[in-house]
């Protein structure tokens, strides 16, 4: 006699940490649709020369796959330092650079070292949703304060809350995801003058920004500023999962205390180095994407949408009577964009010209039925 199958266990059956119960994992929808404009990747595929270089480099590394990789990734960090020196105009050495599996691992290591029980991190929302998730995962108290109307950073309000709360970690995302605005060096200096711990400037979209990189502030504020970046956006290397930071060498010494051993595989290291060798060709698409972003923004505004001015490779736009319903209407027309949880707004990645055209055609139809009554306003209007 066959016994009845046991029911499959659920999370409720597991001895999960109580602070994780009821929470949802991070992640954008990954759907097979004709137009995918939801995760802010560079839509331009790698050149054949880059593909060939990656294949050759991985093949050469494969003969040593029975050995652990260079745990400090010195060659990769040297290449990243050379790229940053050329891109930002600030002299950077390999000892100022640290790399990991995407910038999220970088952020996690930072909070493992500088956050934790009894410590506080502050962010200005809406902003990158992984900041509070990583804070929770490291038992760092998360405090959030709202951005100004129009989603810009109110620097005076930021200074006031940092002065009052005295957090151990402050997050500034520039350009901000999901709203798109950059923060000037003048504003960052004002904030750094009152930050008691460290300021993490998240520059995941830094190559698109009209503002200079905050790496120029590291020499001036060596114990207080760290800049995080990624190769997943402008660098068209999202599948390679490579993030990095720039800071004073002592801060990197602190991360060595919490990083996992051999965290960055030899395959990842050589593939990322190959991508860096082709940086000039890959980043040639940045100007094209900026021009497309501006074209899309103007078209959306002409349809009656409110478009938040962006310094990244995406636009936040609205105002919808029901943003989740509007998101579904885009999907029904074969266009996947992102509902980032801001009431009345959706975010669209800047894609290839034909992808943007498909998005705009869908937007024209949706504008006729889904906009809130007071939505029509010029680009950037508050």
Curated annotation (Swiss-Prot):
Q: Which InterPro entries does the record cross-reference, listed alphabetically?
A: Aminotrans_II_pyridoxalP_BS (IPR001917), Aminotransferase_I/II_large (IPR004839), HisP_aminotrans (IPR005861), PyrdxlP-dep_Trfase (IPR015424), PyrdxlP-dep_Trfase_major (IPR015421), PyrdxlP-dep_Trfase_small (IPR015422)
Per the entry, which co-factors are needed? pyridoxal 5'-phosphate
According to the UniProt entry, its GO molecular function terms are: histidinol-phosphate transaminase activity; pyridoxal phosphate binding
Q: Which UniProt keywords apply?
A: Amino-acid biosynthesis, Aminotransferase, Histidine biosynthesis, Pyridoxal phosphate, Transferase
Query: Positions of the region Disordered?
Result: 1-24
Q: What is its EC number?
A: 2.6.1.9
Protein name in the entry = Histidinol-phosphate aminotransferase
Question: What organism is recorded for this protein?
Answer: Mycobacterium ulcerans (strain Agy99)
Q: What is the lineage of its organism?
A: Bacteria, Bacillati, Actinomycetota, Actinomycetes, Mycobacteriales
Give me the gene this protein comes from: hisC
């Amino acid at each position: 006699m066959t016994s009845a199958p046991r029911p499959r266990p659920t999370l409720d059956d597991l001895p999960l940490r109580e602070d994780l119960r009821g929470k949802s994992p991070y992640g954008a929808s990954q759907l097979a649709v004709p137009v995918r404009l939801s995760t802010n990747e560079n839509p331009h595929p790698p050149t054949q020369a880059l593909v060939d270089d990656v294949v050759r480099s991985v093949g050469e590394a494969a003969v040593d796959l029975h050995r652990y990789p260079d745990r400090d990734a010195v060659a990769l960090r040297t290449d990243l330092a050379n790229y940053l020196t050329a891109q930002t105009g600030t002299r950077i050495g390999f000892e100022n650079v640290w790399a990991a599996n995407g910038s999220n691992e970088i952020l996690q290591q930072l909070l493992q070292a500088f956050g934790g029980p009894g410590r506080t991190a502050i962010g200005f929302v809406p902003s990158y949703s992984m900041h509070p998730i990583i804070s929770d995962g490291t038992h760092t108290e998360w405090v959030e304060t709202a951005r100004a109307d129009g989603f810009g950073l109110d620097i005076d309000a930021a200074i006031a809350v940092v002065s009052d709360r005295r957090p151990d970690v402050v997050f500034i995302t520039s350009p901000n995801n999901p709203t798109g605005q950059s923060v000037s060096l003048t504003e960052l200096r004002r904030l750094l003058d009152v930050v008691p711990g460290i300021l993490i400037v998240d520059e995941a979209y830094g190559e698109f920004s009209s503002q200079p990189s905050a790496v120029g502030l590291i020499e001036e504020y060596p114990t207080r500023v760290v800049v995080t970046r990624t190769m997943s956006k402008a660098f068209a290397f999202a599948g390679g999962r490579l993030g990095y930071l720039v800071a004073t060498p002592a801060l990197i010494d602190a991360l060595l205390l919490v990083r996992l051993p051999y965290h960055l595989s030899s395959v990842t290291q050589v593939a990322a180095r190959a991508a860096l060798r082709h940086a000039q060709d890959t980043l040639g698409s940045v100007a094209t994407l900026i021009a497309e972003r501006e074209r899309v923004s103007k078209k959306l505004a002409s349809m009656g949408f409110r478009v938040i001015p962006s310094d990244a490779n995406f636009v936040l736009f609205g105002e919808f009577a029901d943003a989740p319903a509007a998101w579904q209407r885009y999907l029904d027309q074969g266009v996947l964009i992102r509902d980032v949880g801001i009431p009345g707004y959706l975010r669209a990645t800047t894609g290839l010209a034909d992808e943007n055209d498909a998005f705009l055609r869908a937007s024209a139809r949706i504008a006729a039925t889904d906009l809130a009554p007071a939505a029509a306003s010029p680009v950037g209007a508050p």
